[in-house]
């Protein structure tokens, strides 16, 4: 072990680099449309913070101080543009124009949601755990298990509709004509958990206009309640109706129970299909200001906006409007189901009535206060400049700031707070885990996958350990069924394998029952889920420090999973393996010796013995022997870890698999950083563009840990969210492209909280290098990419103690959080004792001590300053391209020091350009040449231009990109290299190349040595055209994607 050594020279160099970056940033800003739209933010001064930062999405701005996303673009009938609210118990998805039910408008003839239901896309509402029982499901993994049935989430009637009806066929609902809406804006307020709309409605053939304001909340403290407000300000007097609609169209997979009036309220009720002893009730009641005649209330059913469904009910009231005066109508919703309340009708009725008595403003106030408690300002990463609260004018950082808030926000919407539980006398409301689409979508049937345990939980539990109990509570609740599942091996290839009564196995998908089903088999499929649950359990203990809970509730589950694994494995020579299984890469099913599953089994058995000894049970020596001898296959020539024993080089990978061994598994048994780096580079090249939105978060974290140079972790970090988020509210889609006809046939899940969960891990586990290892040591390995000037990390918990950390490029400062109390479960031994901190890889640890008070300063690794290509002047420097690029193939990829990331323009048929800003310290340097790595798709032609003035005018993405245009060239620019036909260093030869061979990454490269050195300039631009990887047909049609640039280095003369 080495002791820390602060290098003064390195600190001075860092300071110079920051000054350089700030100076260079001004030039880089001039060359991007997003920066151009943020031009008003340039004139910043203390107390003059900009109200909002423009994003790349037209009309969408980000208010970083108040955590608000606002859009002025109205996009109706498309699932991507709809907002949602949820509180952990109730969830609802609503139309883009207001809190209405909405059916999707077909896009390219498609309105279908994905596997396994393949139902029509529309707005959705549900209640936590409201699962149905289905005799069969439209699509499955193992159809022969269909005879045992399965469960899918059921909807509840869509409860938020308030329709303004003018009569004569003029009404305001989701189908209102876009042309009648002006001054539109809609805002998602994530500090308050509020969704609002504001616009002017000018109905056709109607002499008058109406200023409209809608507001929607699902109460975070009183989770049986929801609130809707409608404000109407007319241009003329008039009599109208406002209709309180509870729309049964969203109550999918339910049986109608009953509906009607109950006093001044209306209600409806449904059972989930196949579950007759569970009922959900929805109550709704109105109040209003002067002009709202509540005594006129009557049921209506003959309106075009009232869908004819058994569980639909609507109530109309007369409203007298006065010109220029605002009339308010408030809707108070109560909801409950048998799963959480013994008398759901009474619970729903009382919730609605209580909200009405409390009043809208007071109810809203308590809701906002609870969100502030649940989601404090220090619980997300803060990218603002210290002391100024400004974001750097860099669109990458602006979007990173947005997702640092939306990621935990969307996950927290599916959790119930401790205060909320207390308010319902600890009803069992926080035990359902989080489905792929949360509570606002029935994507993936509303089922729970590994997504919850390994993608959503880790980044959430470190900052919100109490809310995150929902993950472990679910697995504990289903533990009894998991024990029974292990005894169903006779339905699988393991029919001759003995599993003891204390062995437990969880199904791949689960809902109400967690039994083995056709969508969620327990055997012959993704056994790794069980080890993922084990990791989730360890994360829970390391963050909360609740050893008693761990011992009594969580360890029994962990021990039973270990027992199952120990009986599942088979001896193969001297090694242990698992046959007929699937690793996380679902493109390879029913294989042997999964390259992630086997290390996961070894780690689970190792930790299980550690915990057994800790609790006085004694280690199982057979488990130790298995753990030390699991089969992990590796190609001998390339040293690439294989996903399965028969894998060959033709493999294309669906999602993160082998790279999971480095993180989150932290597997190091005969697995070095060199192995991890080889695997990362290899599998990054094998990653399918049609894979789901979470893989690149792991790539970022692993790259930050094992890369010896460059800043590819930053590139991968951008890739983890940028291509997947959608306007206006930065919700994740499962896919890079939503059109199933071009994305490999996937109807993407939306919202895809798995993507949020993955991206939510990048900063804390990547840049900070936090590892949740159950050894009583705080493990960190900080390395902040040079593109980020400063980062304050989320407050995170370790053994129940809140810690805060912040970083610049050279160092990270960590201390006990001064504004947070420890959890009640916090390990008391750290109350007055220091925390031991290990920094660095296991074979090169530096030991620190974090005192109970005071700070610990840790030097960052600063790998961005280590040149992959010696003498490279532009590694990790600001870049800009005016051209559209293939999804995720960012311009920054070309200079991040890693060949595994690539810039790829969208079109090969036109000239595309990439401009890099050279650092100020290069102003006196001379350039001797260039090094290019073109990966597998070199351009036909290329040239490099040096210049001191911007080569391109500002190009606004809102008005189209500059593809196909000829770049303007300043008179002072110099073309220093040009090739009309870029030579191939590694041309594809189908006779010599065996596609089945597993080979480490090798790209086509071009090394250029200039005839004589040339002075460095402020900018250098690479222009490329064509793509030598395209076939003749694509070239003639002119519709192929552009060439790839994996790395462009500008080499300084020695």
Curated annotation (Swiss-Prot):
Keyword check for Transcription regulation: no
Broad class of enzyme this protein falls into: hydrolase
Residues the entry annotates as binding substrate: 450-451, 654-655
Subcellular localization: Secreted; Secreted, Cell wall
Catalytic activity reported: alpha,alpha-trehalose + H2O = alpha-D-glucose + beta-D-glucose
Signal peptide annotation: 1-24
UniProt keyword list: Cell wall, Glycoprotein, Glycosidase, Hydrolase, Secreted, Signal, Virulence
UniProt feature, compositional bias: Low complexity: 962-974
Family membership noted in the UniProt record: Belongs to the glycosyl hydrolase 65 family.
Protein name listed in UniProt: Cell wall acid trehalase ARB_03719
Native source species: Arthroderma benhamiae (strain ATCC MYA-4681 / CBS 112371) (Trichophyton mentagrophytes)
């Amino acid at each position: 072990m080495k002791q820390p050594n602060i290098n003064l020279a390195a600190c001075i160099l860092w300071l110079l680099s920051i000054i350089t970056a700030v100076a260079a940033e001004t030039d880089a800003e001039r060359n991007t449309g997003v920066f151009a739209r943020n031009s008003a933010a340039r004139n910043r001064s203390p107390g003059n913070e900009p109200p909002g930062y423009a994003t790349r999405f037209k009309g969408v701005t980000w208010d970083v101080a108040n955590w608000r996303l606002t859009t002025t673009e109205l996009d109706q009938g498309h699932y991507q543009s709809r907002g949602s609210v949820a509180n952990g118990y109730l969830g609802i998805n609503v139309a883009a124009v207001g809190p209405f039910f909405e059916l999707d408008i077909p896009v390219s003839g498609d309105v279908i949601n994905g596997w396994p239901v393949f139902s029509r896309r529309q707005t959705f509402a549900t209640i936590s755990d409201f699962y149905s029982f289905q005799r069969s499901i439209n699509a499955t993994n193992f159809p022969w298990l269909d005879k045992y049935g399965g469960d899918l989430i059921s909807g509840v009637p869509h409860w938020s509709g308030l329709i303004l009806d003018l009569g004569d066929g003029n009404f305001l609902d989701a189908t209102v004509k876009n042309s009648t809406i002006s001054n539109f804006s809609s805002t998602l307020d994530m500090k308050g958990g509020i969704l609002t709309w504001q616009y002017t409605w000018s109905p056709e053939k109607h002499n008058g206009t109406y200023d409209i304001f809608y507001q929607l909340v699902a109460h975070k403290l009183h989770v049986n309640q929801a609130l809707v407000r409608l404000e109407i300000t007319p241009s003329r007097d008039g009599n109208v109706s406002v209709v309180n609609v509870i729309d049964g169209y969203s109550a999918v997979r339910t049986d109608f129970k009953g509906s009607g009036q109950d006093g001044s309220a209306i209600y409806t009720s449904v059972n989930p299909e196949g579950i007759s002893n569970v009922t959900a009730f929805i109550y709704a009641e109105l109040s209003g200001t002067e002009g709202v005649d509540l005594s006129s209330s009557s049921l209506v059913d003959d309106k075009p906006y009232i869908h004819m469904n058994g569980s639909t009910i609507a109530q109309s009231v007369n409203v007298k409007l006065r010109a220029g005066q605002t009339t308010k109508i408030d809707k108070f919703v109560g909801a409950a189901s048998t799963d959480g309340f013994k008398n759901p009708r009474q619970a729903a009725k009382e919730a609605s009535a209580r909200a009405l008595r409390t009043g809208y403003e007071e109810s809203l106030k308590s809701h906002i206060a609870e969100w502030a408690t649940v989601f404090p300002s220090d619980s997300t990463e803060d990218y603002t400049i210290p002391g100024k609260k400004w974001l750097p004018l860099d669109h990458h950082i602006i979007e990173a700031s947005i997702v640092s808030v939306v990621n935990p926000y969307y996950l927290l919407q599916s959790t119930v707070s401790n205060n909320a539980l207390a308010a319902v006398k600890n009803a069992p409301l926080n035990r359902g885990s989080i489905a792929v689409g949360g509570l606002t979508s029935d994507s993936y049937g509303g089922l729970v996958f590994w997504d919850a345990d390994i993608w959503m939980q880790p980044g959430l539990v470190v900052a919100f350990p109490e809310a995150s109990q929902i993950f472990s509570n679910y697995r504990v609740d289903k533990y009894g069924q998991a024990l029974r599942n292990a005894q169903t091996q006779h339905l699988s290839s393991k029919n001759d394998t003995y599993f003891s009564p204390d062995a437990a196995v969880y199904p791949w998908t689960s809902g109400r029952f967690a039994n083995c089903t056709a969508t969620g088999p327990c055997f012959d499929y993704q056994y790794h889920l069980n080890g993922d649950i084990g990791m989730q359990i360890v994360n829970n203990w390391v963050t909360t420090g609740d050893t008693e809970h761990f011992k009594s509730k969580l360890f029994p589950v962990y021990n039973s999973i270990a027992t199952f694994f120990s009986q599942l494995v088979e001896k193969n020579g001297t090694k242990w393996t698992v046959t007929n299984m699937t690793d996380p890469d679902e493109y390879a099913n029913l294989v042997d010796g999964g390259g992630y599953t086997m290390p996961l089994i070894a780690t689970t058995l190792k930790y299980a013995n550690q915990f057994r000894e800790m609790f006085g049970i004694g280690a199982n020596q057979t488990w130790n022997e298995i753990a030390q001898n699991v089969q992990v296959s590796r190609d001998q020539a390339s040293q690439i870890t294989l996903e399965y024993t028969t894998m060959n080089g033709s493999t294309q990978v669906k999602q993160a698999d082998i790279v999971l061994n480095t993180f989150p598994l932290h597997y190091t048994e005969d697995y070095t950083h060199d192995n991890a780096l080889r695997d990362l580079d290899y599998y990054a090249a094998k990653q399918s563009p049609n894979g789901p939105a979470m893989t690149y978060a792991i790539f970022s974290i692993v790259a930050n840990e094992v890369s010896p140079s460059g800043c590819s972790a930053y590139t991968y970090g951008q890739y983890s969210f940028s291509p997947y988020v959608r306007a206006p509210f930065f919700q994740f889609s499962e896919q890079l492209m939503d059109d199933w006809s071009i994305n490999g046939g996937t109807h993407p899940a939306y919202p895809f909280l798995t993507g949020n969960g993955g991206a939510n891990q990048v900063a804390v586990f990547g840049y900070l290098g936090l590892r949740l290892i159950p050894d009583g040591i705080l493990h960190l390995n900080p390395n902040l990419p040079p593109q980020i000037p400063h980062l304050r990390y989320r407050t995170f918990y370790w053994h129940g103690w809140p810690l805060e950390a912040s970083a610049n490029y050279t160092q990270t400062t960590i201390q006990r959080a001064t504004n947070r109390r420890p959890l009640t479960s916090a390990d008391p031994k750290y109350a007055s004792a220091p925390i031991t901190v290990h920094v660095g890889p296991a074979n090169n640890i530096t030991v620190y001590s974090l005192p109970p008070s005071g700070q610990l300063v840790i030097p960052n690794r600063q790998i961005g300053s280590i040149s992959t290509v010696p003498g490279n002047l532009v590694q990790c420097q600001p870049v800009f391209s005016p051209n559209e690029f293939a999804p995720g193939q960012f311009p920054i990829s070309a200079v991040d020091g890693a060949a595994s990331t690539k810039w790829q323009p969208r079109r090969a048929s036109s000239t595309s350009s990439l401009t890099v800003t050279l650092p100020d310290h290069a102003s006196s340097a001379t350039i001797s040449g260039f090094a290019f790595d073109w990966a597998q798709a070199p351009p036909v032609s290329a040239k490099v231009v040096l210049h001191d003035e911007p080569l391109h005018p500002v190009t606004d993405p809102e008005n189209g990109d500059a593809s196909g245009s000829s770049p303007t060239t300043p008179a002072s620019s110099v073309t220093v290299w040009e090739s009309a036909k870029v030579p191939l260093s590694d041309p594809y030869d189908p006779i010599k190349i065996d596609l089945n061979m597993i080979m480490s990454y090798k790209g086509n490269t071009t090394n250029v040595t200039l005839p004589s050195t040339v002075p460095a300039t402020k900018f250098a631009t690479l222009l490329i055209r064509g793509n030598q990887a395209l076939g003749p047909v694509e070239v003639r049609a002119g519709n192929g994607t552009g060439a790839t640039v994996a790395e462009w280095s500008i080499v300084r003369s020695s």
